[in-house]
Amino acid sequence: MIIHPNFDPVAIHLGPLAVRWYGLMYLVGFIAAIVVGRIRLKLPYVAAQGWTAKDIDDMMFYGVLGTVLGGRLGYVLFYKADFYFSHPLDVFKVWEGGMSFHGGFLGVTLAMMLFAWQRKRHWLQVTDFVAPMVPLGLAAGRLGNFINGELWGRVTDPTAPWAMLFPGAMRDDAAWLPKHPELVEKWHLADVFMQYQMLPRHPSQLYEIALEGIALFFVLFLFARKPRPMGAISALFLIGYGLARFTVEFAREPDDFLGLLALGLSMGQWLSLPMILAGIAMMIWAYRRRAANANAAA
């Protein structure tokens, strides 16, 4: 078993100011998006669409607003609505954590629609350009989660090579033991807990880095190297992220205040299903639209 290093969540101390790793990872993610965007400007078909470096800079302004506002509101509404309705001022305590990817996704989508309207472009043309810029930012965010030792995975077999002990999960581990006697006996977890006061878990943050971040980036980046029907790149992002997140959620510990919902699925999985379905529908629409336009021009 591997013991999580339990990093200091503060990366840099500047007198009374503290720069946290999680915030730093957001910065890394936005920088990565800019770099990927500038690389995409070199593609002939992208340049022919009139994209410029200034467009990328302006997109990032909209993207930051959409990510932060959408991510926070998504967490408030999707995950802890009852709490925040009772404590409305706590909505603004972003330093205490609480961001939702699905909320951030909706926020960025609306922000890109606004950007498209101002630039007189079709919003799908904008999201097609942006989609390959997103996954490395997601990977950076999940790395921030791992450094913080949060959003850990479900309890697993201690003999598994990926099994990891998370000091931050001690209280959850103690509460987990009496609820799962069969697994405790099967995996000899009582002995493990007696020795470490922790239980082995999936490092699900690393799985998300690999699937939602690195793998999805290469799939989108390679797919977007050639001209595709409008909406196809955006559709592939929806399908790819939705499938990756849905899969990883089987190894990720559900939020303790929600648990598993209908059909034994987590909130993250239920929110990912519409993304997958919308992506499939959009992909079919994109290619049928191109075929119809080609037939009309023939």
Curated annotation (Swiss-Prot):
<dbReference type="Pfam" id="PF01790">
    <property type="entry name" value="LGT"/>
</dbReference>
<keyword id="KW-0808">Transferase</keyword>
<dbReference type="GO" id="GO:0008961">
    <property type="term" value="F:phosphatidylglycerol-prolipoprotein diacylglyceryl transferase activity"/>
</dbReference>
<feature type="transmembrane region" description="Helical">
    <location>
        <begin position="17"/>
        <end position="37"/>
    </location>
</feature>
<keyword id="KW-0472">Membrane</keyword>
<feature type="transmembrane region" description="Helical">
    <location>
        <begin position="230"/>
        <end position="250"/>
    </location>
</feature>
<feature type="binding site">
    <location>
        <position position="142"/>
    </location>
    <ligand>
        <name>a 1,2-diacyl-sn-glycero-3-phospho-(1'-sn-glycerol)</name>
    </ligand>
</feature>
<feature type="transmembrane region" description="Helical">
    <location>
        <begin position="59"/>
        <end position="79"/>
    </location>
</feature>
<dbReference type="GO" id="GO:0042158">
    <property type="term" value="P:lipoprotein biosynthetic process"/>
</dbReference>
<comment type="similarity">
    <text>Belongs to the Lgt family.</text>
</comment>
<dbReference type="InterPro" id="IPR001640">
    <property type="entry name" value="Lgt"/>
</dbReference>
<comment type="function">
    <text>Catalyzes the transfer of the diacylglyceryl group from phosphatidylglycerol to the sulfhydryl group of the N-terminal cysteine of a prolipoprotein, the first step in the formation of mature lipoproteins.</text>
</comment>
<feature type="transmembrane region" description="Helical">
    <location>
        <begin position="129"/>
        <end position="149"/>
    </location>
</feature>
<protein>
    <recommendedName>
        <fullName>Phosphatidylglycerol--prolipoprotein diacylglyceryl transferase</fullName>
        <ecNumber>2.5.1.145</ecNumber>
    </recommendedName>
</protein>
<keyword id="KW-1003">Cell membrane</keyword>
<keyword id="KW-1133">Transmembrane helix</keyword>
<dbReference type="GO" id="GO:0005886">
    <property type="term" value="C:plasma membrane"/>
</dbReference>
<feature type="transmembrane region" description="Helical">
    <location>
        <begin position="204"/>
        <end position="224"/>
    </location>
</feature>
<keyword id="KW-0812">Transmembrane</keyword>
<feature type="transmembrane region" description="Helical">
    <location>
        <begin position="257"/>
        <end position="277"/>
    </location>
</feature>
<comment type="pathway">
    <text>Protein modification; lipoprotein biosynthesis (diacylglyceryl transfer).</text>
</comment>
<feature type="transmembrane region" description="Helical">
    <location>
        <begin position="97"/>
        <end position="117"/>
    </location>
</feature>
<keyword id="KW-0997">Cell inner membrane</keyword>
